[in-house]
UniProtKB/Swiss-Prot annotation:
This is Interleukin-4. SUPFAM superfamilies: 4-helical cytokines. It comes from Tursiops truncatus. Disulfide bonds join C27-C133, C48-C85, C70-C105. Residues 1-24 form the signal peptide. Belongs to the IL-4/IL-13 family. One of its GO terms (molecular function) is interleukin-4 receptor binding. InterPro entries: 4_helix_cytokine-like_core, IL-4, IL-4/IL-13, IL-4/IL-13_CS. It is found in: Secreted.
Length: 133
């Protein structure tokens, strides 16, 4: 009985520490995958990179990080569904951003940018987030 009472706090601590490690590691892996995909895409020279997309990064006032990720994912989904450009990597980016945002949203931006500029900006945001992870 005495051994059990000594083990309980140790097991609770072990579970808490393991949980923090696993969640931190998931953040790192997801961000690494996003950054790697963005590096590959932004290096490509393709007409698709000149497509106009909604500039969801222009309005950062009163926008949470999760909302930004959600809106960026929505833009990517629109591109790979309607323009058939970079379907596999863009759908992977959309999936990862959606898992980070964990919400649904719509995009109605008047301001536009090119897909290339959009991806470059997203890459910069993800690298900044990774440096804090």
């Amino acid at each position: 009985m005495g051994l059990t009472s000594q083990l309980i706090p140790m097991l609770v601590c072990l579970l808490a520490c393991t949980s923090n490690f696993v969640h931190g590691h998931k953040c790192d892996v997801t961000l690494q995958e996003i950054i790697k995909t963005l590096n590959i895409l932004t290096a490509k020279k393709n007409l698709c990179m000149e497509l106009p997309v909604e500039d969801v990064f222009a309005t950062t006032k009163n926008t949470t990080e999760k909302e930004t990720f959600c809106r960026a994912g929505t833009v990517l989904r629109h591109i790979y569904r309607h323009h058939k450009c970079f379907n596999q990597p863009l759908s992977g980016l959309h999936r990862n951003l959606s898992s980070m945002a964990n919400m649904t949203c719509s995009v109605n931006e008047a301001k536009k940018s090119t897909l290339k500029d959009f991806l470059e900006r997203l890459k910069m945001i993800m690298k900044e987030k990774y440096s804090k992870c």
